[in-house]
Amino acid sequence: MNPRLAACQALAAVLAGRASLSGALPPQLDKVAPRDRGLTQELAFGAARWQPRLQALAARLLQKPFKAADTDIHALLLIGLYQLLYTRIPPHAAIGETVGCADKLKKGWAKGVLNAVLRRAQREGETLLAEVDRDPSARLGHPRWLLKALKQAWPEQLDALCAANNAHPPMTLRVNRRHGERDAYLAELAEAGIKARACDYSRDGIQLAAPRDVRELPGFAEGRVSVQDEAAQLAAEQLESAPGQRVLDACCAPGGKTCHLLETQPELAEVVAVDLEESRLVRVRENLQRLGLQASLVAADARATGEWWDGKPFQRILLDAPCSATGVIRRHPDIKLARKPEDIAALAHLQGELLDALWPTLEVGGVLLYATCSVMPAENSDSIAAFLARTPGARELDLPGPWGMKQPHGRQLLPQVEGHDGFYYAKLIKISAR
């Protein structure tokens, strides 16, 4: 299949609200020749990443918008514009190949429209973009509501935050310290000709200079290393679990933090890992098996403790709460398209329900680490403030360290262009059963 057509099919599913990019793209990649998969992914992710800007430009170029039934043609136009603006593909090839996809979609009528619009974009692109970019939403590549929320939360960091959201994310590894230390693995990478550096904050983290197929990584299949962003790697260290403890990892999929907990503390009594659906636990099982680790996996709503908790208290709980994922937009750019303003309050409510439900399962003297990959205060510091206000037996513990920014409650990491994702942590101790 033509890579532009495959990217178009995936993006159209996202634009229509039928799927996420991570769900829609893999089936399309299977239809593309291996040599074209990188281009397919670049076009789909790139068009989603810059959709607010590309959409604003398309609105200038089109006499009238496409009908809802022609979302695929709309997606094709965005992919064509992305090629002209953001890639080194020769314009004649970008336009010709993109226009030709209309026949494959059995919409030959669209060829003339696509050809005219893309050729005008090629001729007048700079002038039109100067007009389009007067709108900060287009210039910074974020929907208006999201840009407003980010500006309200992070006025001084707004431009850098948007730049990080629009950047290609780095590939970061987590060395399994059961098999050796980071420095030794860095030496192996150097010997294999793979450029990399030690992460700044995670003692197990390595950031690659350029993404690699995991099959090229020494010892990946044997469980010596995993792929995990540096910000997510901080969870295991901050939880400070000890030998003999029983640990709960709530909302555990895809299992990176579950595995890291077991790698850093091999003598835990048990790790119970809960996620909502059995299908989400498939990846967790695969990761545990590859790494040679064991955990008790439970498919259940973590809030419904009566259905899955055996009554034995946990000494440590990691609550990696469902969130807006606004700290990982660069990895999932379709978040810009899928998220709605009302989602933030709904997610904050869900997070509060999870905190309230899981707190009784924690032993007095035990610690709960609350984590999200969001940069929205309503889901982070505000959620913790509300929980502390209604929970007399909860006290906040300090999170010392050089990473992130101290907030009224917890610490916030914002995504960095050449570094970690956006993440939030807060640490609570149970001082009484109230």
Swiss-Prot record:
Name of one Pfam family that matches: Methyltr_RsmB-F
Family: Belongs to the class I-like SAM-binding methyltransferase superfamily. RsmB/NOP family.
Enzyme class: transferase
GO molecular function term, any single one: RNA binding
Residues annotated as the enzyme's active site: C373 (nucleophile)
Name of protein: Ribosomal RNA small subunit methyltransferase B
Reaction(s) catalysed (UniProt annotation): cytidine(967) in 16S rRNA + S-adenosyl-L-methionine = 5-methylcytidine(967) in 16S rRNA + S-adenosyl-L-homocysteine + H(+)
Enzyme Commission designation: 2.1.1.176
Function as written in the Swiss-Prot or TrEMBL entry: Specifically methylates the cytosine at position 967 (m5C967) of 16S rRNA.
CDD domains listed in its UniProt record: AdoMet_MTases
Subcellular location(s) of the protein: Cytoplasm
GO terms under cellular component: cytosol
Organism: Pseudomonas aeruginosa (strain ATCC 15692 / DSM 22644 / CIP 104116 / JCM 14847 / LMG 12228 / 1C / PRS 101 / PAO1)
Gene name as annotated: rsmB
GO BP annotations listed: regulation of DNA-templated transcription; rRNA base methylation
Disulfide cross-links: none
Keywords: Cytoplasm, Methyltransferase, Ribosome biogenesis, RNA-binding, rRNA processing, S-adenosyl-L-methionine, Transferase
Binding of S-adenosyl-L-methionine, residues: C251, C252, A253, P254, G255, G256, K257, D275, D301, D320
